């Protein structure tokens, strides 16, 4: 074995030694040796002496494969730092230079802190003998930068085709940070907000799988825009980065925004579902515990304790009605100025029934004890209100007053109390059931007999045709009664006072006569006929009343105060007409009564006496004339006079005709017969008969009066007529959902649509007095206060000032000697009038004048982005697709259009009107065409500026746009 090691250590036996020879490109010393003993019995050392490559037996072994150098080509060997693995040296060592050329220190450099330069690092020569010092033990230098709370964020690498690694997240998870209270957040609000970061491809909200309640967890996934693959990832990154240090606040709730990485969405959902299960289990446990407590209280008599439970005040026991309530101390509420309205808004997420503001405190009443305990647990010492006294937020502490579980005191049973009967056997139950059924059958049979047998028999027996003698006698009595009435009427008319008896002083009653009696005596004496006047006064005192009261006697029935004239006239009318008149006058409003009084003051020509009208007529014609009531008798005249004022149902706005309008339209029996024919009335076919017709008619009159008063109040508030199209056809408006309202109806209920010619003053001017709110107690003789009114400069003065300003600018340009954009002046900006925009009565927004503008004066320039005609057509289509319905494109000439949709001034808000107050002119300023708005007429302050759009006529009627300008000469359409 010693010989083997000697051979191995010898230099000539090295794999790449100097003694190894190369044969055919391969080394000769690469053959493995066989260390096994020789076959001829000699030892290993002797076997190796014969040959280095052959063993004693003469057996030849395979050669070891030569090494193959991978980078042995000429291109690699020409490199400057190439190392030859076969020769074990650098091939270009001779060309290299040593770094120790005397200019650099042999031991290198070290960095040390320079004490004279505030710790700045300095490089100096390294000394190996110098002992090293640990810099951590030294005192750190003072720095002024802020302490880092987070590590420096790496820059975001945009996603492209050369991206290496997993795809970055493009989904955002939005979840609430507070789970104590129920959230009422609508999904479109979340979706629309996060849609501002990028185009949303998918939006989803998640619910609890156990109870289907919303978890308020939302997933927003973005989609890439064409040509930009990094857009969805960048949008998600921007959304998360914006809310990294602050929460997303919406509808009073705070949300966190995170990227959906490593299954974050599923983890969040599982966490929320688990919390809901735990909360539900806790509530069930508390409910079971409460039920057990209630059962113990009901079974065991109450034992008085040291501290009495809180009680409800005596005045609230009936209102509370043994329900759970939460109480807040009155002293606390008075100290901080908290009212019941604050609790209604603060506890809007809970199902309370009533909030009572009592002198002892504020009481919140609940129907369910569980809801009251939930509110107590979630809001006590958590609900915060702002103190109106101390100007600080304060927390509210609630006190729960549970309902008493004591059973009500037993009361003796009365005859009205129903005691359930208990049957011992089944036979008794069957017998009692049969009795009940037989009693019901008896009752039904009695009703059927009365309705089918007794009723028709009695009506047939009472038929007037069966008693001709009684009918004839009754007719004779009626004729005698009519003759008596006619005689009474003639007698009364003969004794009736003339129009001269109604003195103007009689309108004021007896009090005025006593006070001014001397004047009346003098007047009668002057006339020279005291006897006649006294007689007339005596007749008036007996049978007449003042004229102001007699105006009402024509329609109103006053028992015991009507004059004989009214009684005689009323007897000639039918009872049906009297009832109609009564109901008609009862519902007459005060305005109609005042109108009637005003009309009564006018003098009317005195009618001819009855004898003169009857004179010259035959007996038959006289009888026929007297058979008609007084108001229906014909009168001689040039033109026929109507008896009743004309009432056209066609002009009635309401589709449902009220009972008052029906009575106004039906005046006599002829109208009643026509009405029966129109509605195909048949007495025998009437099914639903109203028993108390007077009460039903009174209720209809009451409803009509209330409806009319409501309409008057609405017209006073809205300053416009109310349309029935605004009424909800299915109950309330919430039941109908969202619907598009025509622009014509918006002028009824929108404040800015009510006044077309007098728009609302939407701009507040400092220094202008509000004359409506001035002190009314000031006398007219008070000297006027000194007020400053700004002087109104004319357009001519403005142009002169502008020219002077332009000359100053030209002088500055000449002094500088160079053209500059800073010294360019748009003259139109100096000449424009003070205008503003506000809600318009015509359409959306409008342009208003802040001061009076004279005719032919310039108002404002229509500015915007100058584009070509093809670009304008393309933008118009794009605006329509994006939902921008209003067009702000103004044509200058055939090839140029001004687009003020996104870049422009307030002149774009000018609306169309068929009777415009302004016109547009194209002028040149500095060699460039500009659009300028001029006044066609004098315009008042706060008046809306309008302009005729001059659209071309559309051939398709569906494409025409309705015009809402409200001008007298309105064409109806814009195009």
Curated annotation (Swiss-Prot):
S-adenosyl-L-methionine binds at residue 949. It comes from the Eukaryota. GO terms for molecular function: histone H3K4 methyltransferase activity; histone H3K4 trimethyltransferase activity; RNA binding. Transmembrane segments: none annotated. Its EC number is 2.1.1.354. Residues 516-535 have a biased composition (Basic and acidic residues). The RxxxRR motif forms an adapter helix that bridges the nucleosome and ubiquitin. This is Histone-lysine N-methyltransferase, H3 lysine-4 specific. The gene is SET1.
């Amino acid at each position: 074995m010693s010989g083997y090691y000697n051979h191995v250590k010898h230099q000539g036996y090295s794999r790449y030694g100097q003694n190894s020879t190369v044969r055919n490109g391969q080394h000769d010393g690469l053959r493995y040796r066989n260390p096994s003993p020789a076959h001829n019995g000699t030892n290993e050392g002797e076997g190796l002496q014969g040959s280095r490559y052959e063993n004693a037996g003469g057996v030849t072994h395979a050669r070891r494969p030569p090494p193959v150098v991978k980078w042995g080509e000429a291109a690699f060997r020409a490199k400057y730092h190439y190392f030859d693995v076969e020769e074990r040296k650098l091939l270009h060592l001779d060309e290299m230079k040593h770094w120790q050329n005397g200019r650099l220190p042999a031991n290198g450099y070290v960095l040390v802190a320079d004490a004279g330069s505030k710790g700045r690092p300095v490089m100096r020569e390294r000394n190996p003998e110098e002992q090293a010092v640990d810099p951590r033990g030294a005192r750190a230098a003072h720095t002024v930068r802020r302490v880092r709370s987070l590590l420096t964020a790496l820059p975001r690498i945009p996603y492209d085709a050369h991206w290496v690694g997993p795809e970055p997240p493009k989904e955002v998870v939005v979840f609430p940070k507070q789970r104590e209270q129920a959230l009422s957040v609508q999904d479109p609000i979340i979706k629309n907000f996060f849609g501002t970061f990028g185009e949303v491809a998918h939006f989803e909200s998640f619910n609890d799988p156990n109870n289907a309640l919303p978890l308020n967890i939302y997933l927003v996934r973005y989609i890439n825009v064409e040509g930009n693959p990094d857009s969805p990832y960048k949008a998600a990154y921007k959304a998360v980065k914006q809310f990294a240090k602050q929460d997303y606040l919406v509808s009073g709730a705070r949300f966190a925004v995170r990227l959906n990485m490593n299954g974050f969405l599923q983890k969040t959902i599982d966490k929320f579902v688990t919390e809901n299960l735990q909360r539900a289990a806790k509530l069930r446990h508390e409910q079971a515990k409460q039920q057990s407590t209630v059962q113990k209280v009901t079974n065991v008599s109450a034992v008085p304790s040291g501290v009495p439970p809180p009680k409800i005040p005596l005045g609230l026991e009936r209102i509370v009605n043994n329900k759970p309530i939460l109480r807040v101390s009155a002293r606390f509420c008075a100290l901080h100025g908290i009212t019941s309205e604050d609790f209604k808004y603060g506890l809007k997420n809970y199902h309370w029934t009533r909030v009572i503001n009592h002198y002892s405190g504020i009481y919140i009443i609940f129907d369910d004890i569980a809801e009251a305990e939930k509110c107590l647990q979630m809001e006590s010492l958590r609900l915060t209100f702002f103190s109106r006294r101390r100007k600080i937020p304060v927390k509210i502490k609630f006190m729960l007053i549970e309902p008493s579980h004591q059973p009500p005191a037993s009361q003796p049973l009365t005859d009205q109390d129903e005691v359930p009967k208990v049957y011992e056997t089944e036979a008794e139950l069957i017998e009692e059931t049969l009795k009940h059924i037989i009693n019901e059958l008896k009752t039904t049979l009695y009703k059927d007999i009365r309705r089918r047998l007794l009723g028709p028999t009695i009506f047939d027996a009472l038929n007037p045709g069966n008693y001709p003698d009684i009918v004839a006698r009754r007719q004779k009595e009626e004729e005698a009664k009519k003759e008596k009435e006619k005689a009474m009427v003639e007698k009364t008319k003969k004794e009736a006072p003339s129009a001269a008896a109604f003195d103007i002083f009689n309108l004021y009653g007896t009090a005025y006569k006593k006070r001014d009696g001397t004047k009346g005596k003098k007047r009668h004496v002057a006339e020279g006929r005291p006897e006649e006047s006294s007689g007339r006064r005596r007749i008036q005192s007996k049978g007449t009343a003042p004229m102001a009261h007699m105006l009402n006697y024509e329609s109103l029935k006053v028992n015991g105060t009507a004059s004989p004239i009214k009684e005689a006239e009323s007897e000639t009318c039918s009872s049906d007409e009297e009832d109609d008149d009564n109901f008609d006058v009862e519902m007459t409003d005060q305005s109609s009564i005042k109108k009637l009084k005003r009309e009564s003051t006018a003098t009317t020509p005195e009618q001819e006496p009855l004898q003169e009208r009857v004179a010259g007529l035959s007996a038959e014609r006289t009888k026929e004339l007297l058979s008609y009531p007084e108001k229906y008798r014909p009168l001689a005249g040039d033109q026929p006079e109507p008896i009743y004022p004309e009432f056209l149902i066609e002009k009635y706005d309401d589709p449902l005709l009220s009972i008052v309008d029906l009575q106004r339209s039906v005046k006599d029996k002829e109208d009643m017969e026509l009405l029966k024919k129109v509605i195909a009335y048949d007495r025998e076919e009437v099914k639903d008969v109203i028993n108390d017709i007077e009460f039903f008619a009174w209720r209809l009159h009451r409803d009509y009066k209330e409806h009319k008063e409501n309409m008057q109040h609405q017209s006073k508030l809205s300053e416009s007529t109310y349309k029935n199209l605004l009424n909800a056809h299915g109950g309330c408006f919430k039941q109908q959902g969202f619907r598009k309202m025509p622009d014509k109806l918006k002028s009824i209920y929108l404040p800015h649509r009510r006044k077309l010619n007098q728009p609302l003053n939407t701009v507040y001017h400092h220094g202008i007095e509000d004359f409506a709110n001035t002190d009314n107690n000031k006398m007219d003789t008070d000297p006027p206060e000194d007020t400053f009114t700004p002087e109104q400069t004319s357009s001519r003065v403005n142009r002169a000032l502008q020219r002077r300003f332009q000359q100053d600018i030209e002088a500055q340009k000449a002094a500088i000697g160079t053209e500059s954009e800073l010294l360019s002046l748009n003259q139109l900006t100096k000449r424009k009038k003070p205008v503003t925009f506000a809600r318009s009565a015509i359409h959306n927004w409008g342009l208003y004048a802040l001061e009076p503008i004279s005719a032919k004066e310039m108002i404002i320039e229509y500015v915007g982005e100058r584009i070509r005609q093809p670009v304008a057509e393309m933008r118009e289509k794009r605006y329509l697709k994006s939902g921008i319905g209003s067009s702000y494109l103004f044509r200058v000439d055939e090839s140029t259009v001004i687009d003020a949709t996104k870049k422009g001034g307030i002149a774009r808000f000018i609306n169309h009107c068929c009777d415009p107050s302004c016109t547009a002119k194209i002028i040149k300023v500095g060699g460039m065409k500009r659009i300028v708005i001029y006044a066609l007429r004098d315009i008042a302050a706060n008046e809306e500026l309008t302009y005729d759009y001059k659209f071309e006529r559309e051939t398709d009627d569906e494409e025409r746009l309705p015009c809402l300008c409200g001008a007298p000469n309105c064409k109806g359409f814009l195009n």
